[in-house]
Amino acid sequence: MVLCLCVSLVVACNPAPEEGTPNTPNTPEQPTEPEQPTQPEQDSRNELVAQKGYPSGVEVYYFKNYYEESSDDYCSGYYAIVDTKSNPKLKFNAVYVENDATPSNIFASFAGGTPLLATNGGYFWDGESLSLLISGGKVESIAAQYTYPSYEGKQYTACPRRAAFGVHADGTMEATWVYCCPDDNNRPYSFSSPKGNNEKVGVFTSTPHSSSSGKLWTPQEAIGGGPMLLKEGKNVAESNYWKEVLHSGGTAALTYQPRTAIGYTNDGKIILFVCDGRKMNGSSGYTLPEVADLLKGLGAVWAVNLDGGGSSVMVGKDGKALNSPSDGTQRRVPTAVVISMEN
């Protein structure tokens, strides 16, 4: 399948860090011969429409991309590029809600400045967050320490390291694998890989990861999900889907679904992405490797998948959903991402 995208930016890839040394964002060592992404063929039916009314440093686009020239199937959605360096008043906020709410309601009640955009956040079950969330330097929700995958008819216990995106106090951005270590009061530790599990072949680590093999992770704001979609510009979505033990949970990486994702570029721009699926507005959705390819084409070097399916929504500056959630209405969620501007 040829994936036709309305993007044209390219990005260099950086060398992989050694195990036990989490990546250091925004100051990567540059390779001598950077790999360049292969640009897909363009379909004349594709659409890319800039949304008006956002302040300097925020660009929001509607896209509609056909899968193949011979096909009438397509994916549509929205993405936003947020440049906090060009406009220092712009802020990334990870928001935790004790009594879950729709992203539009979270947007409306946001008190940390003027909200401009919001998306749903990490995974949850029965209103309880299953993903890491750090707000104002405080851990509001830890990442799931245990999950219970099935392989060949048998249920196992696994301790997954899962992807998260964070912004540090100095403004640097980082995507890494996180585990909240019981041997240090469940504080989040960063790891350079999801090492230890592979749901595809039935290999699982049931012993909690030790803080001694990671690095204490202390961003000011962070949202967790998984899997990691891009690592140093390389599409790692499919392999990490299995290694982060997300198949049994219903993430459905290799089928067309509504998706939400977040990434960042080498020069420190945040990219938020949401696509519709399940034929809402005719959109089939994307696989996770396709989302990774699109984000890479926009310049992202690291990217993290967030909760998708019926949860996927992007709220615009007027507080209303830009896309069309597949449930027909917005789901109530315990975590969200809000882009705001200081008053």
Predicted regions, residues:
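Short acidic-glycine loop/turn motifs at beta-strand connectors
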Residues: D83-S86, G166-E174, L230-G233, Y264-G268, ...
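Sec-dependent N-terminal signal peptides
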Residues: M1-C6
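Active-site-adjacent helix-turn-beta-strand microarchitecture at beta-sheet edges
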Residues: E128-A253
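Conserved, well-ordered active-site substructure
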Residues: E128-K154, N240, E244-W302, L306, ...
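C-terminal motif of bacterial Sec signal peptides marking the signal peptidase cleavage site
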Residues: L9-A12
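Short glycine-rich loop/turn motifs
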Residues: Y74-Y79, R162, G224-G226, Y256-A261, ...
